[in-house]
């Protein structure tokens, strides 16, 4: 049956190739536009760490001005980072499986003169648990031990590109890298790792590159290192670095791993008890509003996917519907031109159902051809987006989006062909038999 319907559809398409090509192009254009913008939305809103996103939680606490909330436009909103003093205290908990605060810093690397000139890097100042939390893959070596956090010991993890630049991509574990005024021993080298979106710290761009080097957090003290990301506060930051660390400035991203509901409840109780203790000391005087946000909820709060992306996706789907509706008239004219032939077939015993299925199948063949054309055009569209917009993210078609394009093509073919197929199968054979 299917082979017969396919032969009939191909024969019909060949009968008027120009008109058939016009219909295919119409569906192809609609598929191209819709697939392009659905793909951008899909990739921007994808889960960056699906195997453990439900056990990673971003910690938020409200240390803001008692007289005025963090965001007047969003009642209940709290600062999206925490203070250094709060990080130190809550990291004393042994409830989380893994935990750690981190921030982005700007430092200079001084390679040997024969290798390269000194260059500036973006560093992630973090604890050993950072790597256990977010699972960046290692090419050489491994994470530094937790004991190195306390010293802190002069150990470093390099990203793939920095290792290429300094050591030509060779195993550099055990070798030294000079950062600022200190020599650090390489503990590990990452494989290429660019989580998209950059969920662990999206504050300066959810699609920016991951950091180039990773260092123990407490080196911020000897260097008096300030964050290269966002820093907010409602009080004076102090006159020196020590006062800055003790201030109400928020600039640290705090994550914990809680693998069970029991852990989560216990940790929430711990945070509430900590905040209540701070209230007695005259801090955190706003209503207690601690938050533990899983990865996808955190990304939603940070509005990682811009509203424009959602709007463009919806508009592109409407454009596809318009393309399909505009093809109804063309298909209707094409089918009705064969009305005498269909009248004879009906008189010879062909059922309405058979005629309807034949023409619907032809529309779906057109839809599939248009879908194939649309996928090719969407590849060009995504390439144009990658070229025009300078972000550290490459939009590409994956298997899900190709399948979505195929599904949309079939739906578009059905929308365009349903009414014309119904009209042609409803003709009265007697009218055309008289004409014959």
Please describe what each predicted stretch is.
Residues 16-50:
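Short, strongly hydrophobic transmembrane alpha-helices
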Residues 20-21, 312, 376, 399-407:
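Hydrophobic alpha-helical transmembrane segments
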Residues 37-111, 117, 248-253:
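Membrane-proximal extracellular/periplasmic loop immediately following the first transmembrane helix
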Residues 128-143, 154-302:
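Mid-to-C-terminal secondary-structure elements
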């Amino acid at each position: 049956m299917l082979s017969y319907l396919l032969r009939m559809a191909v024969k019909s398409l060949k009968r008027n190739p120009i008109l058939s090509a016009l219909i295919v192009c119409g569906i192809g254009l609609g598929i191209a536009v819709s697939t392009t913008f659905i793909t951008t939305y899909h990739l921007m809103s994808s889960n960056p760490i699906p195997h453990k996103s439900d056990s990673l939680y971003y910690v938020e606490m409200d240390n803001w001005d008692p007289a005025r909330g963090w965001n007047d436009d969003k009642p209940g909103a709290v600062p999206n980072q925490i203070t250094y003093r709060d990080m130190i205290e809550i990291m004393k908990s042994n409830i989380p499986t893994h935990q750690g605060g981190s921030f982005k810093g700007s430092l200079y690397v001084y390679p040997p003169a024969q290798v390269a000139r000194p260059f500036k890097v973006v560093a992630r100042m973090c604890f050993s648990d950072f790597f256990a939390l977010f699972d960046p893959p290692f090419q050489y070596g491994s994470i530094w031990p937790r004991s190195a956090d306390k010293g802190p010991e002069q150990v470093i993890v390099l990203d793939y590109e920095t290792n290429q630049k300094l050591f030509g991509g060779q195993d550099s574990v055990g070798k030294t890298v000079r950062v600022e005024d200190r020599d650090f021993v390489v503990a590990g080298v990452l494989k290429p790792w660019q989580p998209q979106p950059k969920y662990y710290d999206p504050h300066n761009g959810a699609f920016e590159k991951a950091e180039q080097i990773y260092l123990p957090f407490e080196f911020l003290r000897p260097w008096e290192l300030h964050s290269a990301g966002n820093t907010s506060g409602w009080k004076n930051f102090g006159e020196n670095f020590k006062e800055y660390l003790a201030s109400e400035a928020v600039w640290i991203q705090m994550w914990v791993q809680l693998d069970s509901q029991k852990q989560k409840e216990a940790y929430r109780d711990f945070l509430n008890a900590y905040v209540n203790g701070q209230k007695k000391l005259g801090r955190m005087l706003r209503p207690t509003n601690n938050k533990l946000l899983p990865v996808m909820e955190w990304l939603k709060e940070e509005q990682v996917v811009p509203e424009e992306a959602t709007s463009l996706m919806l508009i592109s789907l409407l454009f596809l519907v318009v393309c399909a509706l505009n093809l109804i008239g063309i298909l209707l004219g094409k089918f009705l031109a064969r009305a005498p032939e269909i009248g004879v077939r009906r008189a010879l015993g062909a059922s309405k159902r058979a005629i309807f299925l034949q023409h619907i199948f032809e529309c779906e063949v057109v839809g599939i051809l248009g879908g194939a054309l649309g996928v090719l055009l969407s590849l060009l569209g995504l390439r144009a987006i990658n070229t025009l917009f300078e972000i550290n993210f490459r939009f590409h078609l994956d298997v899900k989006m190709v399948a979505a394009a195929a599904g949309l093509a079939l739906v578009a073919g059905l929308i365009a062909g349903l009414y014309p197929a119904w009209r042609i199968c409803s003709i009265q054979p007697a009218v055309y038999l008289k004409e014959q």
